Amino acid sequence: MTPFRKLTSAETAALEALGNSAEDWSKVLVSEDFKPFQLLQSHLEGDVEIAAEARIVRSRVANYRIGTGSLVEGVTALECRRRSAFGNGVGVATMNECGGRTVKIFDRLSAQVAYVMAVYRHRPQTIAALEKMVDAYAEERSSEIGEVGSDCRIVGARFIREVRIGNGVEIDGASILENATLCDGARVGVDVKAYDLIAAEGSVIDNGSIVERCFVGESCRLDKGFTAAESLFFANSHCENGEAASIFAGPYTVSHHKSACSRSSTPAAARTRATTSSRAAPCTSRCTCAAASSPAAPTSCRPRSRAPSRWSWDTTPTTTTPRPSPTPI
């Protein structure tokens, strides 16, 4: 473990000269070879630990450990506000939206264990034993201080709250991440919103995807606005465009479905203009209505319900010859 020390008065003055501030500089611990230029225009709150070669630029950090060589830049809030298990032990209502087959997720969950917890409900002692082990593991992983691993890149994100971040993780432009664990090599992209999440090694969540109470397994990919809730995705699954609710997606599940609604390609304003112009079409030379002689008269002919054709250009009343009554026999 990297040894940490408190800041000297000279380092504190240098940090403030670079536009940095802290709620309490005495709670900030740094590595032995710390240099003041590692922080720029940032604000620190609570207990913060900064490892060697880590950088914090224009960000607010509260109660976090920043690992060796990691970059935190342009982050609205990287904070741990309370004691958290970082997504471990969260119940996911998979296969049954009413919660009859709830699986408690954790960062070492496998498809086999999840299957037993979801399907073998007729063995309550087995389920109780598994859930007890998961609860104990979640308590072991709980902490009041969040963690960013080594060689991570967190840029342009807004709110990252109660998230444990593994080594080599990349977060680029995420909107909000809350109560989650991102394992080694995971990637979270632009406009992603995630709550109560476990993202396993090498997983990717990108392009506006929304995830709530989900397990995203090793090398899985959720992309192009995919929305998922109460679902489990295991190794190498790939889902885009659509949505998932209470899904148990085994390894190599693929979904690229997107519902489409057909509509007219003509814009509403253009359709209105076309309708208006067709109703106000000028009368032709064949028309015998008042518009032919008076400019103030209506400039269009209207359909006649009793006309033999769709449009009547002759306004002469139509006379109908009554049929003779049948002769009684």
Please tell me what each predicted stretch does:
Residues 1-246, 250-264, 268-269, 273-274, ...:
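Domain-scale signature associated with acetyltransferase and cell-envelope carbohydrate enzymes
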